[in-house]
């Protein structure tokens, strides 16, 4: 999911405005550090999650000078981690550094940095290196951050750790060395499981699935997915990624119904800002729906920001809808590079059978009787013996129930039966039932996504039990008093 996370920017020309912008960035970073510090002491993970979101908003504005000033403020100058992180930052000119030093010198630095702040510094520098396209330095920085994470076992670090895991994998993917870290990711997933770090398990499971699918290792990905522990999702983004990878695995395994549900749910749960991810989900969902014999609505291809990316799939859908094998072949050749880069080439090869079935269904509806020679011509079969192939295709379609017809082998005809009233069958009921089930599932997911006060039901129960206990104590005291009166 590189499209929706990686942020590209143009290199800003050097100017004298750095002296006015750097202090503001440094000021924001200080506020974020204070938020992380408060969350660490209070053990409130939501504060640290908010700090990460604020950091993503500042991502485009990060400069080497402001990062250097922040490292001097948070870390002890001359310490091992300070020296290591400072070595990754490029040296700015003296004027910029003087401004940052003057700005940071007015603030009292943190004497004993928390592990959360140290990990946050790793995250900041790593994001900066990736945005500057310094991937080799980013790989070294990410490896150092992962080594530091192994020595920290605090639940307040989990949010920062999950981000570091993602960028750690992204660095190696951008350099084409994704296979090198598969063993390390498995080890990290094992550590996260032992530490009951559920957010880390979610993130690492998705990274491992992405790693396997990148090299088309679908069987290994399914074995890992089926054996990995599952629990309630902590991150909506990670759950969307998981559903997308699950949909891809199900598609390759020919489980198209489950794949369609997973892919559509992933596209629906994805953030609106993640346009690239939603485009990928829609591409796979369109192919899966075509393989199921469905024709996606035109509105699917007209979604805002997706028209250009989904154009090849729109033309492909049109060829499948018409049942024109020659048009389908031309579209597949025209956009072969696009389908190859999307990883859907093998699925489009499977669609050829659906195109033939659709064309045959149209012929069956249009003609009450037609010769197999004409069937072969209309389907545009390019085999050495098209009539024999047409006879075989018609026979299989009749056997599978795709068309309601009979085959006259003696005369070489396909005789279609009269089409019945579809409203007298169970198909409308099945269609309505599927739509109602979809709405009910969406309602249940919305209810489960609501946030409730922690332990609210337990507090209510404890209050009721307390009243019962007090009532029982009063009755017991009254009973004892009556017994004492009887003794007298």
From Swiss-Prot:
Q: Does the keyword Transmembrane helix apply?
A: no
Q: Which gene encodes it?
A: 21D7
Q: Where in the cell is it found?
A: Nucleus
Q: Name one GO molecular function term.
A: enzyme regulator activity
Biased-composition ranges, Basic and acidic residues, are 456-481
Q: Keyword Ubl conjugation on this protein?
A: no
Residue ranges of coiled coil: none
Membrane-crossing residue ranges in chain numbering: none
Specify the PCI domain's residue ranges: 240-421
Task: Report the GO terms under cellular component.
Answer: nucleus; proteasome regulatory particle, lid subcomplex
By its UniProt entry, which SUPFAM superfamilies does this protein fall under?
A: Winged helix' DNA-binding domain
Q: Which family does it belong to?
A: Belongs to the proteasome subunit S3 family.
Report keywords, A-Z.
Nucleus, Proteasome
What SMART domains would the database entry show?
PAM, PINT
Quote the subunit structure annotation.
The 26S proteasome is composed of a core protease, known as the 20S proteasome, capped at one or both ends by the 19S regulatory complex (RC). The RC is composed of at least 18 different subunits in two subcomplexes, the base and the lid, which form the portions proximal and distal to the 20S proteolytic core, respectively.
Q: What does this protein do?
A: Acts as a regulatory subunit of the 26 proteasome which is involved in the ATP-dependent degradation of ubiquitinated proteins.
The identity of this protein, by name, is Probable 26S proteasome non-ATPase regulatory subunit 3
Classification via InterPro entries: 26S_Psome_reg_C, CSN3, PCI_dom, WH_DNA-bd_sf
Question: Which PROSITE patterns does the record associate with it?
Answer: PCI (PS50250)
């Amino acid at each position: 999911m590189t499209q929706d996370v990686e942020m590209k920017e143009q290199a800003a020309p050097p100017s004298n405005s750095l002296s006015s912008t750097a202090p503001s960035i440094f000021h924001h970073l200080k506020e974020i550090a204070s938020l992380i510090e408060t969350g660490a002491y209070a053990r409130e993970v939501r504060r640290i999650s908010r700090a990460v979101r604020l950091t993503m908003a500042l991502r485009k504005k990060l400069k080497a000078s402001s990062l250097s000033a922040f490292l001097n403020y948070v870390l002890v100058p001359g310490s091992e981690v300070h020296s290591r992180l400072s070595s990754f930052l490029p040296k700015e000119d003296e004027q910029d550094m003087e401004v940052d030093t003057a700005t940071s010198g007015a603030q009292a630095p943190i004497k004993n940095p928390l592990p959360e702040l140290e990990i946050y510094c790793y995250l900041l520098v790593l994001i900066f290196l990736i945005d500057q396209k310094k991937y080799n330095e980013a790989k070294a920085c990410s490896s150092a951050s992962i080594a530091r994470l192994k020595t920290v076992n605090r639940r307040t670090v989990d949010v920062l750790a999950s981000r570091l895991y993602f960028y750690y994998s992204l660095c190696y993917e951008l350099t084409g060395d994704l296979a090198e870290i598969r063993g390390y990711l498995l080890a990290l997933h094992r550590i996260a499981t032992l530490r009951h770090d559920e957010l880390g398990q979610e993130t690492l499971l998705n990274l491992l699935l992405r790693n396997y699918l990148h090299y088309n290792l679908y069987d290994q990905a399914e074995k890992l997915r089926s054996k990995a522990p599952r629990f309630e999702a902590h991150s909506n983004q990670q759950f969307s990624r998981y559903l997308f990878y699950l949909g891809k695995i199900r598609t390759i395994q020919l489980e198209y119904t489950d794949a369609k549900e997973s892919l559509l749910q992933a596209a629906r749960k994805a953030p609106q800002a993640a346009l690239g991810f939603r485009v990928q989900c829609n591409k796979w969902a369109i192919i899966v729906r075509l393989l199921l014999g469905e024709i996606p609505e035109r509105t699917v291809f007209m979604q805002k920001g997706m028209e250009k990316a989904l154009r090849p799939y729109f033309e492909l859908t049109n060829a499948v809808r018409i049942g024109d094998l020659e048009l389908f072949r031309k579209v597949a050749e025209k956009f072969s590079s696009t389908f190859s880069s999307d990883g859907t080439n093998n699925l489009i090869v499977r669609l050829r059978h659906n195109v033939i079935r659709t064309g045959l269904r149209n012929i069956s509806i249009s003609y009450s009787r037609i010769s197999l020679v004409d069937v072969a011509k209309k389907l545009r079969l390019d085999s050495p013996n098209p009539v024999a192939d047409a006879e075989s295709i018609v026979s299989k379609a009749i056997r599978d129930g795709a068309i309601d017809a009979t085959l006259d082998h003696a005369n070489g005809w396909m005789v279609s039966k009269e089409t019945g009233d579809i409203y007298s069958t169970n198909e409308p009921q099945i269609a309505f039932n599927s739509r109602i089930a979809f709405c009910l599932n969406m309602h249940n997911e919305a209810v489960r996504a609501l946030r409730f006060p922690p332990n609210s039901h337990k507090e209510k129960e404890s209050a009721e039990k307390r009243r019962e206990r007090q009532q029982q104590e009063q009755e017991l005291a009254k009973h004892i008093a009556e017994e004492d009166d009887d003794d007298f």
